[in-house]
Amino acid sequence: MSALNDGIKNDASKIWLFDYDLTLYGEEERFVLNSLDHRIAEFVQKTVGGTFESATEIRKDYLHRFGTTLSGLMAMNGTAPDDFFDFIHEPEYLVYPKVSTEKFALLKSLTGHRFVFTNGRGDWSRAGMARMEIAPAIEDVFDLKLMDWEGKPHASAYEKIEKWLVARGVLNKDAKDKSQIVLLEDSLRNLEPAHERGWTTILVNPNVQAPDWVDFHIPHLLNLREKLISNP
C-alpha cells in the first residue's frame, strides 16, 4: 500500500466521486444489484432469444468483454441505450437500498465536492439515493449518458468527467496533480484507470485483496470514517 494509506485529508480541495452499485450501498445489500441484474438478463433474453440461463451467461460475457452489458448489446445487437434502461429501470421489478442516516451523516461530513460517477443511467442511482435518504449530500450524478454510453473502465469516461468537473469550476483545467479527485469503487478494474490518471483510489470491497497501487482499502463505505484526517 502507498504511504497515503495512513489517512486521507478531509479538506475543501477534495472532489469525492462515488460509484453507486456496491459502493454507496454495500455487499450486505447485494439483493439490490441482483434485482437489476435479473432485469438486465430478461432484456438480453428478449433481445437475443433463448433461455433465461443462456441470457444470464451472455449478460456476464458482455460485461466482461465490453465493460458494461449495454456496450455489448450496442455492439453486438444494435440496442438503443434508452430502450435498455427504460426496460431495466421499471421500478415495480426492482429492490432499493434501505434508509441510512449513518451514510448521510458521513457524506455530509466530507468537505469539498461530492458526486456520483456511475456506469448506469442516472435515474437508477438517484432513485436509490432517495430511498437511502442521502440524495441531499450529493451534488450531482455523472452517468453513462454523460459518458456517451462508453463507461468505466474506458479511458474516455475518466477524461469526460474531468472535463465536466472543469466546466463546473471545481477542477483546475491546468492541474498537474489530480490526487484531489478521490474515487471510491468496488471494482479494481474501474479503479486502475483512475490510478493511472493520478487520482486517489479507494477500494470499497470486503471480498478482494487490494494490490499495492490502491491508496486505501475499506470493506464498506462507513469505514471511510476511520481513514479521514480533518484539518485542525
Regions found by a protein language model. Give the residues of each.
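N-terminal helical cap/lid subdomain that shapes the substrate entry/recognition surface
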Residues: A3-E102, D123
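Residue-level marker of alpha-helix boundaries and capping positions
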Residues: F31, K60-D61, V116, Q180-V182
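N-terminal start-of-chain detector that recognizes signal peptides
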Residues: V44-Q45, D86-H89, H113-V116, D174, ...
